[in-house]
């Protein structure tokens, strides 16, 4: 009996191994993922859903910026090491948080890689013209991801120094060699590559989407071009593309701030309304894993490093402006909590995506209106101002104030100059909105 038993036991691994070899061959005969077996323009469109970065830099950049102060209280603490390292401008070695530099880098280059897979497939087919809309979207996604990376990992663009500042590696084809190095090039070269993709994509991109506010449409491409050319210091082009977004009457397409301000600030009511896809003011929406929707509002989470009362009342939301007291004149209600020093507007929803109900495990998600008409209008105003067209800049500011203030305030250039001319520059002991 022992002999027979040993015989069958010995044979069992051989049988399993044989089955494994058959299964392995079947597995290896299949493509590892659907991106490698694209056959139709519809399948390319499905792939391009993943060509939008699954990350947004708001949390990181707010911690880096002068919108955040250290709040001194014995019961207020940092949310995690990432928040503390970011605020203190330390080298960030945390990688788990979705908004760390590491994860931002990975998410945006993953989006670029996905776009490159789509572009490579389109370039390989005989009926490439049938894929024009998909090619346009892929090029815009690649340009957008690289532009977003440039705002975090590169020096601010200056046409006088861009030839000397480092850019970023700009992959234009699928990676086939592990560890292949791509030269970073200069910031000028990076912007040239972004512009090339942007302009080609703009010509090709379509409008037929099941959920257009989550994809690049013509309008979203124009809004992207406005911001890109503003950053690139080509102000005439920024104005040109903003005109295409805003039309002859910008106030017709701006957000209805009165309606939004009537909503209750508790829960996700205001934030959900702000990013509603049916709102014509929203041009491109980006839902991503993010904790910023809850850390930025008046909760105890991350309350040591926050946009607090002092900032709000002297520099930002409730500070004086040429239109008067911002906290009273603007069509928004500043949300705050007496238990912490956090002052905020409710514009970013926070929704946990549950992965395991029994274990209570989930991923926090937020949604960002990365392009909207109000922002595009103010970008055009900035382009006008930086090119010396001050009267036109004031007209755009007044268009925004007409929908953003309770009294539909209108300003003159002299009033703006007088207000900021008499305002002292910021000092740590006497903070103001005016900074060098």
What are the functions of these language-model segments?
Residues 82-154, 185-188, 200-206, 361-368, ...:
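Conserved, well-structured interaction surfaces
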Residues 2, 24-71, 309:
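Membrane-proximal, proline-rich intrinsically disordered regions
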Residues 239-374, 398, 404-436:
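Hydrophobic-face positions in mid-chain alpha helices that act as interaction patches
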Residues 25, 219-253:
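Aromatic-residue-lined binding/catalytic grooves and analogous aromatic/hydrophobic interfacial grooves
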Residues 1-24:
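Sec-dependent bacterial lipoprotein signal peptides
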């Amino acid at each position: 009996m022992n002999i027979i038993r040993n015989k069958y036991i010995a044979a069992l691994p051989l049988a399993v191994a044989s089955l494994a070899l058959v299964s392995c061959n079947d597995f290896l005969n299949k493509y590892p993922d659907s991106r490698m077996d694209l056959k139709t323009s519809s399948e390319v469109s499905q792939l391009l859903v993943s060509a939008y970065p699954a990350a947004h830099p708001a949390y990181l950049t707010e911690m880096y910026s002068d919108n955040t102060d250290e709040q001194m209280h014995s019961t207020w603490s940092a949310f995690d090491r990432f928040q503390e390292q970011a605020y203190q401008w330390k080298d960030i070695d945390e990688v788990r948080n979705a908004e760390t530099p590491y994860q931002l880098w990975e998410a945006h280059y993953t989006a670029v890689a996905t776009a490159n897979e789509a572009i490579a497939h389109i370039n390989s087919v005989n009926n490439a013209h049938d894929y024009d809309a998909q090619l346009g979207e892929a090029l815009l996604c690649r340009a957008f991801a690289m532009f977003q990376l440039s705002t975090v990992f590169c020096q601010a663009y200056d046409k006088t120094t861009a030839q000397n500042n480092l850019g970023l590696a700009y992959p234009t084809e699928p990676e086939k060699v592990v560890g292949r190095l791509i030269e970073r090039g200069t910031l000028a070269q990076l912007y040239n590559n972004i512009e090339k993709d942007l302009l080609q994509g703009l010509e090709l991109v379509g409008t037929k989407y099941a959920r257009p506010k989550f994809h690049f449409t013509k309008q979203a491409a124009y809004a992207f071009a406005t911001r890109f050319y503003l950053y690139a210091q080509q102000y005439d082009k920024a104005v040109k593309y903003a005109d295409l977004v805003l039309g002859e009457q910008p106030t017709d397409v701006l957000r209805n701030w009165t309606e939004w301000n009537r909503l209750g600030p508790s829960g996700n009511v205001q934030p959900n309304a702000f990013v509603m896809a049916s709102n014509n003011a929203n041009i491109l929406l980006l839902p991503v894993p993010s904790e910023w929707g809850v850390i930025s509002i008046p909760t105890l989470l991350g309350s040591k490093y926050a946009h607090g009362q002092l900032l709000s009342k002297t520099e930002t939301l409730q500070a004086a402006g040429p239109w008067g007291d911002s906290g009273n004149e603007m069509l928004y209600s500043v949300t705050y909590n007496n238990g912490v020093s956090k002052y905020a507007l409710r514009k970013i929803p926070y929704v946990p995506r549950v992965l395991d109900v029994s274990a209570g495990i989930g991923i926090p998600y937020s949604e960002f209106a990365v392009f909207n008409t109000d922002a595009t209008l103010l970008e055009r105003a900035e382009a006008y101002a930086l090119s010396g067209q001050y009267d036109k800049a004031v007209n755009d500011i007044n268009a925004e104030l007409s929908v953003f203030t309770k009294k539909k305030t209108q300003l003159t250039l002299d009033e703006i100059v007088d207000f900021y001319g008499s305002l002292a520059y910021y000092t740590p002991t006497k903070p103001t909105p005016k900074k060098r």
